[in-house]
């Protein structure tokens, strides 16, 4: 059996739409100053998880990564890390998409919550690892102890963003899926 690997116009439009929403959601933020750099509470992670849940791993990861990277390119503070953001937020969408597509094709709120949780955990590990090695030790020249302080200072915002995404993305996914199905615009 041959697998259809063509990307449709509808899929391209959905990737672009969700990437734009991720970019805007990332911009809706409250910056928090820290000892080294800043952290932020924002809505981008909800939309990264939503991208993976609705579009699946590869297209959802692309939408999450592109939208987040575009936001970083628009902010001089983050532009130098946009390539890392593309990879890390892309992984967020990929992991959420892999979990939602694992097993039965049909999914519900519970499976969407597990997908958002796994995506959030994967992203948190990648983000805190980047904070320790890249931002802390490489870019700021911190000692190991200083890099750990930087990681610990990022934990509250990272945890808050993850919890909001774990709660919000499945609710949005179920509502959007139902509305799209009812209007015969199903994305499954």
Task: For each feature predicted by the language model, list its residue ranges.
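Loop-helix junctions at membrane interfaces
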Residues: 1-188
